[in-house]
Regions:
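Structural preference for solvent-exposed beta-strand-turn elements
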Residues: 1-196
């Protein structure tokens, strides 16, 4: 069972997160940020990950700390669940349509985390959610997971759809990348012999 569990408490947030890579797409999410709950539920569903999350944050200030810290914890859970990374396909990508939006996501479980976005989100808010926090979330996730993540918005002008497409697309790309190729189950997919 490839599982990562993270408990992280700071002066700004108290987070408990459990991730199962080989799940069924069940999300049990309470981040304290309604829009992020919706996005993470979609991420779990499209990645076929089981994700349980509880976060108590200083949302009276704003949602920034909760969103970024959840990205940190999800990244750490991915890194933990992947272990030595033996047998994984390593790479995953998708070009995902959502109505007028077209989103490309590509992931490399390289051990060298980095986030490389090309997103043009027209609105500063979707409901009460600051749209710039989407990039903050993915940057924290990529850094902590050791995953190189590219997101390219190929079309779209609806801010909700653009953000939603990022979470769905990353879920699909990561599902491919974490899949075990059983013919090479004892090999790390790198000529270096390690992905760290």
């Amino acid at each position: 069972m490839r599982t990562g569990e993270i408990n992280r408490r700071t002066a700004e947030t108290d987070i408990t997160l459990r991730l199962e890579l080989d799940g069924t797409g069940v999300g049990d999410i309470d981040s304290g940020v309604g829009f992020l709950d919706h996005m993470l539920t979609l991420f779990a569903k499209h990645g076929h990950f089981d994700l349980t999350l509880r976060c108590v944050g200083d949302n009276r200030v704003d949602d920034h700390h909760a969103v970024e810290d959840i990205g940190i914890c999800l990244g750490q859970a991915f890194r933990s669940a992947l272990g030595e990374k033996k047998g994984i396909c390593r790479y995953g990508d998708i070009t995902l349509p959502m109505d007028e939006t077209l989103m490309l996501a590509a992931a490399d479980i390289s051990g060298r985390g980095g986030f490389f976005p090309d997103l043009r989100i027209p609105a500063s808010k979707v409901g009460t959610f600051d749209t710039e926090l989407g990039a903050e979330f993915w940057a924290a996730f990529a850094r902590e997971s050791g995953i190189t993540l590219h997101l390219r918005q190929l079309a779209g002008d609806n801010s909700h759809h653009i953000l939603e497409a990022t979470f769905k697309a990353v879920g699909h790309a990561l599902r491919k990348a974490v899949t075990v190729d059983w013919a090479f189950a004892q090999e790390v997919p790198s000529t270096k012999g390690t992905l760290s």
